[in-house]
């Protein structure tokens, strides 16, 4: 039996592991994809206190090495179920293998929804970004586009309008789902231009992003020259498989009244997987440290 099993090896999960390992606990971490989570997408991290600049990849590598050197055990399997007794089931081909712990921390994070268009993967980190607060400062006095129609897209447009020379807000409809206060502000902002009833259908360039192919609802195609594209079409948490041990809100996030406990004793949540107002690296590591500390205290 493990002391703590952590599901997810992003900043929240790895920080939880760090605190647990320093308390001499036996820790197992499950990761279905790549260690680091969403922060891997960040070209540079410049808003983490005490670190002037670091790539998301380098930050993730450093954090991984830190917990690995302290004795963390990693398994690259997909968790498919957790029961009330903290028995963890995975997609391991040998179905009779399960894992048990005194405490479980769910830190599965979220996935950014993709446009799934030509060039999106090719120019990731070369003009394509899913995080305006992470990468916006690299586009100072440049021209950028944002695609999306919810609050994230509108907030990103407000934020980027103070940094970029020009901001194009592209939306597939003529009305937005986001709040009116953001729209009113954007309509008064001189360097913001709306491109409505349109989709980004292709991303083009050479060594970096140079232009977007835009197709409107009349199937008219045009080219928009920009330096960057911020994709803000939503995020998807991955919590449905845990709904027997946690409560989930209408958007799929884990409900926690105090930000750490779930409805099941000794099963905790940390990071972007839970309902919260701000999803940043700093809030993820904060969640992870709190979850581990509380889990240890309540063992």
Residue ranges and their predicted role:
Residues 74-138, 149:
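Glycine/small-residue-rich loop that forms an oxyanion/phosphate-binding "nest" at active or ligand-binding sites
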Residues 1-3, 76-77, 140-142, 197, ...:
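Phosphate-coordination loops involved in phosphoryl transfer and adenosine-cofactor binding
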Residues 8-13, 109, 148-150, 271:
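Conserved phosphate-binding and hydrolysis motifs of nucleotide-dependent enzymes
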Residues 2-70, 152-179, 249, 294:
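Beta1-alpha1 glycine-rich phosphate/pyrophosphate-binding loop at the start
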Residues 116, 122-138, 233-283, 287-290, ...:
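FAD-site-proximal beta/loop scaffold in flavoenzymes
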Residues 67-89, 95-101, 162-257, 299:
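A Rossmann-like FAD-binding core segment of flavoenzymes
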